[in-house]
Amino acid sequence: MPELPEVETSRRGISPYLVDHTILYAEVRNTRLRWPVSGEILSLSDEPVLSVRRRAKYLLIELTRGWIIVHLGMSGSLRVLPEYSEPEKHDHVDLVMDSGKVLRYTDPRRFGAWLWTDNPETCSVLAHLGPEPLEAEFSADYLYQASRGKKTAIKQWIMDNKVVVGVGNIYASESLFAAGIHPDRAAGSLNENDAAVLVSVIKQVLQLSIEQGGTTLRDFLQSDGKPGYFAQELRVYGRNGEPCRTCGTPIETAKHGQRSTFFCRRCQK
């Protein structure tokens, strides 16, 4: 599933081709995504694009009369192509631009979404999200105070979008390893130093992944069709049974909330 770095990589890739350009029309070949494609998108015509933003794992395309909200789901990707590029089986949505380019949405599993809102601040899918991990609001003091009394395993807790957005499965495993924190520890067991270290490494891991263009494990491609390269930096994720790159102990795996967690028993306490 594309996580925050992959969505931010997509945002940076598509923005130059959308902002200060006009959407001539949308071509929707399949409206049956996770939710039906909003009618306002189906009827787009000569809509200037003012900005492309990201909130959590949602892309927000600002138009003069409203906002398109895009979620990539489990297998979605966005590419910028010449206007008359022949669509393939899983190419469901095109935004045809006045520049002769098309923004094409591909989603084999169709768990993504193309929604419309007049105001992102009141949109139901955005209203209850926690702070952005790369912003100042996500601080050591915030994480420490929020974790008080929490018995949930720290891995599962930091993946809760009400706590902090965008720390998905890959980056939760990698951040906890970098912080030396065992994923089974109760969130409430963190002391102030633990919280400071964890906040710092979450920011570092996410920023490094963005700089590397995200992580390509299966479906994710950047807007130019190239893979993300952060997979080469992974220390624990997907390495079950392989030696820890720090101490040599075999990497182990466990389940947290139906998701696989990877960790080093020796390095993480």
UniProtKB/Swiss-Prot annotation:
Q: Which reaction does it catalyse?
A: Hydrolysis of DNA containing ring-opened 7-methylguanine residues, releasing 2,6-diamino-4-hydroxy-5-(N-methyl)formamidopyrimidine; 2'-deoxyribonucleotide-(2'-deoxyribose 5'-phosphate)-2'-deoxyribonucleotide-DNA = a 3'-end 2'-deoxyribonucleotide-(2,3-dehydro-2,3-deoxyribose 5'-phosphate)-DNA + a 5'-end 5'-phospho-2'-deoxyribonucleoside-DNA + H(+)
* Cofactor binding, note field: Binds 1 zinc ion per subunit.
User: What's in the keyword line of the UniProt record?
Assistant: DNA damage, DNA repair, DNA-binding, Glycosidase, Hydrolase, Lyase, Metal-binding, Multifunctional enzyme, Zinc, Zinc-finger
EC number per UniProt: 3.2.2.23, 4.2.99.18
Point out which parts of the chain are FPG-type zinc fingers, as ranges: 235-269
Lineage top rank: taxon: Bacteria
Q: Where does DNA bind?
A: H90, R109, K150
Q: What does this protein do?
A: Involved in base excision repair of DNA damaged by oxidation or by mutagenic agents. Acts as a DNA glycosylase that recognizes and removes damaged bases. Has a preference for oxidized purines, such as 7,8-dihydro-8-oxoguanine (8-oxoG). Has AP (apurinic/apyrimidinic) lyase activity and introduces nicks in the DNA strand. Cleaves the DNA backbone by beta-delta elimination to generate a single-strand break at the site of the removed base with both 3'- and 5'-phosphates.
What is the protein's quaternary organization?
Answer: Monomer.
By sequence similarity, the record places it as follows:
Belongs to the FPG family.
What is the protein name for this chain?
Answer: Formamidopyrimidine-DNA glycosylase
Organism whose genome encodes this protein: Pectobacterium carotovorum subsp. carotovorum (strain PC1)
Q: What is the lineage of its organism?
A: Bacteria, Pseudomonadati, Pseudomonadota, Gammaproteobacteria, Enterobacterales
Q: Source gene?
A: mutM
